[in-house]
A protein has these predicted regions:
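Catalytic and substrate-binding clefts that recognize carbohydrates or anionic sugar/phosphate headgroups
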Residues: 1-133, 143-144, 149, 156-161
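Aromatic-lined carbohydrate-binding/catalytic grooves of carbohydrate-active enzymes
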Residues: 130-270
């Protein structure tokens, strides 16, 4: 089956694809719910342009597929943490394939009679999230570009005016001071407690997003704390890893370290 497959990867598996086969899953990806005829890359990326079908990677990479046919359904979980690739018939309608840059070819075939059976088998392998609070399952309004608290409150008010159910308003990175995590832009967003209380009075929860990058900015409390505590990810040479995101040059907490996870939990609960 591998003959003629253009994706020649160190780790690869090719599967026969039936004519009625549909594909779902893979996490945060462009395109329709049915991923047939698409190709994707499992490599988390923050693309600032419009998310058209041509983008193969977005924010999340979940190498888990649910395959639905007229008479059957099954799942495949590819257990590989390296940069990987999925082609679901875009190259050829006779097959689909998965490839990775390195690692082992480990994958799980999950059988069942229904989609919920497949999801149950997948979460049995990977772990299950506790049942969240009810409001988290409602409608959430989230977008980049609300440049002030007044803008967010205006949108929230419109939901109530039009009697459209909405449980939560999200604050994107504009609420931060210079895109520094765990800060607040008081100039445009005012008093945080007051702003959030105004939304609560109208029945909204507020969610303030947190980005993974910490601005490389000596004198900025979270940066200085991370350097002093040796909290940030490093290169193979032992230097703190630096790459640019929204604040410019940034460093990244190494959540593989227990002390970093503990620090993160403490900050979020304060």
């Amino acid at each position: 089956m591998s003959a003629g497959v253009s994706g020649s990867y160190p780790v690869q598996t090719v599967k026969k694809m039936d004519g009625d086969e549909k594909f779902y899953g893979l996490g945060d990806k462009t395109g329709f719910l049915n991923k047939r005829d698409y190709e994707y890359e499992n490599w988390n990326s923050d693309i600032p342009q419009a998310h058209t079908d041509s983008y193969r990677a977005l924010y999340k990479s979940i190498p888990f597929l649910i395959t639905l046919k007229k008479e059957s359904v099954y799942g495949i979980f590819f257990d590989n943490t390296y940069r990987s690739y999925v082609n679901l018939g875009k190259e050829n309608q006779a097959y689909f394939y998965y490839g990775a840059d390195a690692g082992n070819l480990d994958y799980y075939f999950i059988a069942g009679d229904t989609m919920p059976d497949i999801v149950g088998g997948y979460t049995y392998l990977t772990g299950r999230t506790p049942l969240p609070q009810l409001w988290t399952l409602g409608y959430h309004q989230s977008r980049w570009g609300y440049d002030s608290a007044d803008c967010i409150k205006k949108v929230a008010g419109k939901y109530r005016e039009l009697d459209i159910p909405c449980d939560t308003m999200h604050f994107d990175i504009d609420y931060m001071d210079g895109y520094r995590v765990f800060t607040w832009n008081e100039k445009d967003y005012g008093d945080p407690a007051g702003t959030i209380q105004e939304l609560a009075d109208e029945g909204f929860k507020a969610v303030c997003i947190i980005d993974p990058g910490v601005k490389l900015d000596p004198g900025y409390e979270k940066y200085d704390e991370g350097i002093a505590g040796d909290y940030f990810a490093k290169t193979p040479e032992g230097e703190v890893y630096v790459n640019a995101v929204w604040p410019g040059d940034s460093v990244y907490p190494d959540f593989g370290q227990p002390k970093v996870r503990k620090c993160g939990q403490k900050i979020r609960s304060s």
